[in-house]
Amino acid sequence: MVKLGFVIAEFNRDLTFMMEKLAEEHAAFLGADVSCKIMVPGSFDMPLAIKTLLQKDDIDAVVTIGCVIEGDTEHDEIVVQNAARKIADLSLEFGKPVALGIAGPGMTRMQAEDRIDYGKSAVEAAVKMVKRLKEIQ
């Protein structure tokens, strides 16, 4: 059974809550176990929590769940670009999948509501990567 850790952003919690629930349902459907969840203030705050989960022997992969909505400045782009870069770096550093389930940047609130399946897609990617990496080890 694949053991997942979830890192969930509290910012835009109404949306990340729906993303989290869909992700949990999909994990159960795939036969994966969500072993641990860590709530962080926002997507930019995820890397340290991800690193903490990746250090645990009982976590096979981490799923990120966040939602970054466009504002009047380029803040949303900076947040997502930096979070995505660090997330990829951590995956390579620890040799474990970290799936990007962050919706944004450059989207309106209505577009964000249409993208709540990003968490589900991230679970799918994480489980597939764990299984495929085990096949070649």
From Swiss-Prot:
SUPFAM superfamilies listed in its UniProt record: Lumazine synthase
Molecular function in Gene Ontology: 6,7-dimethyl-8-ribityllumazine synthase activity
CDD domains given in the database record: Lumazine_synthase_archaeal (cd09211)
Record-listed (2S)-2-hydroxy-3-oxobutyl phosphate binding positions: D72, T73, R115
Keyword Transferase included in the entry's annotation: yes
Binding-site list for 5-amino-6-(D-ribitylamino)uracil: F11, S43, F44, D45, C67, V68, I69, L100
Protein name according to UniProt: 6,7-dimethyl-8-ribityllumazine synthase
Organism this protein belongs to: Methanococcus maripaludis (strain C7 / ATCC BAA-1331)
